[in-house]
């Protein structure tokens, strides 16, 4: 979710 993207913004 968004928290995951914030924790690991590296895509």
From Swiss-Prot:
Subcellular compartments: Secreted
One cellular-component annotation, GO: extracellular region
Keywords, ordered alphabetically: Amidation, Neuropeptide, Secreted
InterPro entries in alphabetical order: Periviscerokinin
PTM annotation (Leucine amide): residues: 11
Biological processes per GO annotation: neuropeptide signaling pathway
One Pfam family in the UniProt entry: Periviscerokin
Family: Belongs to the periviscerokinin family.
Function of the molecule: Mediates visceral muscle contractile activity (myotropic activity).
Name listed for the protein in its UniProt record: Periviscerokinin-2
Source species taxonomy: Eukaryota, Metazoa, Ecdysozoa, Arthropoda, Hexapoda
